[in-house]
Regions:
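Donor-sugar nucleotide-binding helix/loop cap in glycosyltransferases
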Residues: 1-148
Length: 148
């Protein structure tokens, strides 16, 4: 499966959608839309983020990673999803730079990384998607700092 560049901007909602789909294996796009108060288009953004992270399959069935998370670490769903993001080839590079250079500007670097791995999009798309990744990484960094 070719990975789709993420469009979901709220990482907490990605985790929530993943948990909902996992706990409701027969759910439909409309079920998720009703649960989250989303349009069907927004559901697709968040489901695609879950697919990108290998949390659900194309048909929304459970992946081996999802089963492992809920079987072995059910109290640590967020931590495991965050770990998956950090280990991602694209997002991990951006996360590492943000850790190493906390006061730096990260969006231009993120755009360059995203362009390298996902050629063929417009500059506006690169800027939006890279901004989402930077937001996700900031969220994870804040979470790590709070956990100590």
């Amino acid at each position: 499966m070719k990975k789709i560049l993420i469009q979901a901007n709220n990482l907490d909602t990605v985790v929530d959608v993943f948990m909902y789909i996992y706990m409701h294996p027969e759910c439909t796009h409309q079920d998720v839309a009703d649960y989250c108060g989303f349009t069907l288009r927004q559901v697709q953004y968040y489901a695609n983020a879950c697919k990108y992270l290998d949390l659900i399959n194309e048909d929304w069935s459970k992946t081996a990673l999802a089963i492992d998370i809920f079987t072995n670490h059910p109290a640590e769903v967020k931590d495991r999803v965050y770990a998956r993001i950090i280990s991602d080839e694209v997002m991990g590079q951006i996360f590492a730079r943000m850790i190493l250079l906390p006061d730096g500007s990260h969006n231009a670097y993120a755009v360059d990384v995203v362009k390298e791995y996902f050629p063929g999009y417009s500059d506006a798309v690169y800027e939006r998607r890279a901004d989402n990744i930077v937001k996700w990484c900031k969220k994870i960094i804040s979470y790590i700092k709070l956990k100590g």
